[in-house]
Amino acid sequence: FGPRDSGDSSEIFGFLSSRLDSLALSEFGRFPRAQVRMQLENLRGRLRRAAEVQAARRADGWRIADTERDFSFSEGGFEFAGRIDRIDARESGGRPGFAVLDYKTIDKVSSGFARSEHLTAKGEWKNLQLPVYMRAASEMYPGAEISCGYFYHWNQFTLCHNTCRPYHDANYCTY
């Protein structure tokens, strides 16, 4: 998100917008087709909303600690390896806290989408991505409170923060 520690949505958006311009120029040249220009402006609107959400998150004390973090571990005779999109950090009451975030891009999401996609009706995990990420993060940050969730990207960004219990718990949280 560019200026990692900025709480200014205009500064964050300015960075993201200039990166979009640079990428568009290298990919599509100086005179992209009308359809491409429309898509770029649509994306620019999404980036503006992402900048607002990021600035609000920063104002709440969260900072981006790491991105694209590789991990591997063994559990129960299985080897796990992957890459966490983003890890945020915050001090709360003297105890460090970390939020493991996975970016998701979809066209439309309902308030019940995340829960129904990732938990059974009984509240048991059926999509193990976040529990695996939390397990990895618990080794990266021993003794820290770990939360997890999704940073959804569709027509607008939405981010909500809840603390998850340990990865084996059936409770679910979204960002």
Regions found by a protein language model. Name each.
Residues F1-Y175:
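Structural signature of nuclease core domains in nucleic-acid processing machines
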